[in-house]
Amino acid sequence: MRDTDPAPESDRLGDHPHPRETAILLGQSDAEQSLLDAFMSGRMHHAWLLTGPKGIGKATLAYRMARFVLRHGSPEVAAAAGATNLQTPMDHPVFRQVAAGSHPNILSLRRPWDEKAKRFKTVLTVDEVRRTTGFFGMSAGAGGWRIGIIDAADDMNVNSENALLKILEEPPPQSLFFVVAHQPGRLLPTIRSRCRTLRMTPLAAEDVAAVLDASNNVKANEADRLAMARLSEGSVGRALAINDGGGLDLYRDIVALLMELPRLNIKNLHKLADKIARRGADDAWTTGIDLLGDWLQRLVRTGAGAPHQPEFVNGEAASMVRLAQSASLDRWVEVWEKISQLVARAEALNTDRKIVVLNIFSMLESVAGSHAGQHQSA
């Protein structure tokens, strides 16, 4: 990174377009209509809490609404223009300004880049949130609105949340806040009470696949795009991360090892661990660990009697049933929780990632073999 390069953005996924640059939003027509109706009523609430799983379009909707408000300014102007959705043409000056991050009436808050440490700060700091004081204290330019977008509120600490609460409690005229939250239950209840909650839902696999199809950064064939869409569980952001991290190949390798439990092919395990844990392969690490966690979650659901999920590898469903029956549901829940704690600790302490992967599979091997061991001792 050169000194002249812009600072990285924590709310941008890899080389993919930032939500403010994204013109199309699929699968969220109900949420879009709710915002449109609120604005056209002339009684637009000043703060909106956009909730739902990560990567489903919450920030994209926030920027889409911000462009609409800044373009039209009032319900009367929007009605006169015949607006029936929140779309702003890409060649419109407002779209271009917002996409460039240069519109004076939008303030975007995210985890800041630490130039000295050359990494993102771990929290959305109180100093970042306090920027709202000066921003909303200035008179707005064209359109009369000032809009703050927080992506994501999950990154705030208590001090940041209290700073946000102050501005939410005394909102200036013609101010709008869009607060993106993946797990809103973790926010201060007083913040939630000041906002109108808009719950957004995961997308259909076909919608996720359509976004992948339209992306210039996704080179996968149609079958693989659909597989990534299904693995993403309705999250475009997740599907793009799977693509970037070589997720389909990783998933096949992971499942091949899991299907052999309680026996492990040590050679293949080390090959997988090297692939996930190699230096500089952050995408592969994040994607591989996430996919393994998802597989274990589906295993627990299977053990609890949930309907079988579609399989992505031949024989996967039968192996999942077999493993679910190889130990009690409590044991699988316990190991799932322990693995989550192990990964979190490894991230915090910068532990050798290969050792983490080997330990994870050792734990799984132990649980999968426990039932057989009990029979032998009996």
Features from the language model and the residues they span:
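Conserved Walker B
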Residues: A152-M156, L168, P184
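Charged, glycine-rich active-site and insertion segments that engage polyanionic ligands
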Residues: M1-F68, H72-A80, T84-Q87, P93-Q97, ...
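Loop/turn-to-beta-strand initiation segments
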Residues: A142-I147, P172-F178
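Conserved catalytic/switch belt of AAA+ P-loop NTPases
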Residues: G137, N162-L176
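Residues at the beta-strand->loop junction immediately N-terminal to the Walker
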Residues: T51, I150-D151
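Conserved D-loop-proximal element of ABC-family nucleotide-binding domains
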Residues: V126, V158-N159, P189
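Flexible beta-alpha connector loops of hexameric P-loop NTPases
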Residues: K116-V126, A153, T197
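Conserved alpha-helical scaffold flanking the Walker A/P-loop in AAA+ ATPase domains
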Residues: S34-F39, H92, V123-I147, D155, ...
